[in-house]
Amino acid sequence: MPVIKCDSIYKIFGHNAQKIFQSTDGAIDTDALQQAGCVVGVNNASFEVHKGDLLVVMGLSGSGKSTLLRCISRLTEATAGKIYIDGEDLLALSEKKLIELRRNKMGMVFQSFALLPHKTVLENIAFPLQVKGASTQDSINRAMEMVLLVGLNGRENNFPR
């Protein structure tokens, strides 16, 4: 079972985007959308991510990468499509369940992220777990697992440059 499954995700920005999209039967007519003042942010994205996979979303500036990720986290609502996290229909979750899922199963690293310069690599990785209430030892142990997973062993005591 995939950890993340996206099936035919569309995001169209603009007035009456949902209504205009439904009238196209999924066949995006860019001219009609432009005439209606709409912009396509994500056009029929479908993929699966399985445990242990690494997925890279690449594209030019403005091509919809961040919009797709915002749809997956439901920070932006998709115009159409289905999104599943661990088999759970993300679009059917209550606000409370969505908050719980965001806290425990997903996170975003922003393009202009900042490391805490007074903390080591290991401490920077452990910090969010401590904020969530994990003990120092548990968070350090989990952070060390991540250090090993991404090949930073031997650098865990370094400070950011």
In which residue ranges do the predicted regions lie?
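Conserved ABC ATPase "signature" region
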Residues: 23-31, 88-89, 130-133, 137-155
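ABC ATPase NBD coupling module
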Residues: 32-36, 90-107, 136
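The feature captures the beta-strand-to-loop junction immediately N-terminal to the Walker
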Residues: 58-60
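Helix-to-loop junction immediately C-terminal to a conserved catalytic motif
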Residues: 73
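ABC nucleotide-binding domain "signature motif"
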Residues: 79-89
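Interfacial catalytic loop of ABC nucleotide-binding domains
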Residues: 93-96, 141, 157-159
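Short coil-to-helix segment of the ABC ATPase nucleotide-binding domain corresponding to the Q-loop/switch region
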Residues: 118-126, 159
